[in-house]
Amino acid sequence: MTWICVITLFALASATLGNKVSRVGVLFPKTRNDNECTARGGLKGSCKSLIDCPSVLATLKDSFPVVCSWNGRFQPIVCCPDAIAPPPVTTTAVTVISTKEPKLPRLHISGCGKRKVKIDITTVGRSGSPILPPISTPQNSTGGRGIIAGGVEAKIGAWPWMAAVFVKNFGIGRFHCAGSIISNKYILSAAHAFLIGGRKLTPTRLAVRVGGHYIKRGQEYPVKDVIIHPHYVEKENYNDIAIIELKEELNFTDLVNPICLPDPETVTDPLKDRIVTAAGWGDLDFSGPRSQVLREVSIPVVPVDKCDQAYEKLNTPSLKNGITNNFLCAGLEEGGKDACQGDSGGPLMLVNNTRWIVVGVVSFGHKCAEEGYPGVYSRVASYLDWIAKVTNSLDHAVTN
């Protein structure tokens, strides 16, 4: 390439000598002496043979040099700059794309997760069954099925965030599902309980009772709306979560208080080997009688991969993607303890320093307390962004 440029210079020079008039942009600047010159860019330089000026040789393909003279017809003497001009400084607008996950909201209602009725944290219910047994020795099934299959009756006031949802027909309310209080206006529940046959239950037909131990007691509140997760699809089990908005605000008492939502830091926590508690008024057995009092059961968390292997055997179309990390699974390997029909929408709870947190929403299972099939819950931590949006960050009633 260099020699092509030299030949080009020679051709240009020949044309110049032949016509005696320069017709190209080759400059012959006047200087104080024959050796000094001004190179392109205004740099001071000295006249040298092209071969002896590497900086000019390097730029021949981009621009013609300043020619001082010719040594014969084939050797141009060029203005070789004494110093190389620094490249021009350019500024380019740079868009920085963060690779970090967006910060999840911290949704805490002041005083949430506290039980105002004094209860021994290691024993609950009339039978004194431990709700937080040692992790290394989880509870064994007694063979009987109580809860919510396999549980015990809760002590009055043990779970002040429990809510019972009723559907009214001709003015008569019928128990429909459960939920958990997360603020004075919102109840967390399951989507599948409110979307039936492609239609959402009319809010005016719904009522929520709180503060009751017996299923037919408690304070009743009308429902303003039910917000179903936008990605929930009927007859599938994914994104099975909903929020009930009440027409009137709840009055918090010893028997009515919100449960805490998970901290953002728990989103990826598998809760391995943790003992969790479910509560509700559901069936005492699969297709069995319904409980008339609030019951509870404590069960260990089952790893998602193990849970997925279990449900893969059923080859059910409602789980086309298997059990994902947006679920939590819990139950005894030998069965005997589980949530059951009617417990849908109720909370799966975890205690942390005496503060109770809703980590799951009762979603589905294979029958109830079936051996080898843990209960499956919508993982609340996976939906914190959606909950914050729907509740307008719990209507700003948030404390960090």
Curated annotation (Swiss-Prot):
Residues 36-80 form the Clip domain. Residues 148-392 form the Peptidase S1 domain. InterPro entries: CLIP, Peptidase_S1_PA, Peptidase_S1_PA_chymotrypsin, Peptidase_S1A, Ser/Thr_Proteases_Immune/Dev, Trypsin_dom, TRYPSIN_SER. Keywords: Disulfide bond, Glycoprotein, Hemolymph clotting, Hydrolase, Protease, Secreted, Serine protease, Signal, Zymogen. Glycans are attached at residues 140, 251, 352. Its main location: secreted. GO terms for cellular component: extracellular region. One of its GO terms (biological process) is protein processing. Residues 104-124 form a propeptide. Its EC number is 3.4.21.85. Residues 1-23 form the signal peptide. Strongly inhibited by alpha2-plasmin inhibitor and DFP. Partially inhibited by benzamidine, leupeptin and PCMB. It is an enzyme of class 3 (hydrolase). Belongs to the peptidase S1 family. CLIP subfamily. Upon activation by factor C, it is converted to a two-chain active form composed of a light and a heavy chain linked by a disulfide bond. This enzyme is closely associated with an endotoxin-sensitive hemolymph coagulation system which may play important roles in both hemostasis and host defense mechanisms. Its active form catalyzes the activation of proclotting enzyme. Does not activate the mammalian coagulation factors factor IX, factor X, prothrombin, plasminogen, protein C or prekallikrein. Does not hydrolyze fibrinogen. Does not catalyze the activation of factor C or coagulogen. This is Clotting factor B. It comes from Tachypleus tridentatus. The lineage of its organism: Eukaryota, Metazoa, Ecdysozoa, Arthropoda, Chelicerata.
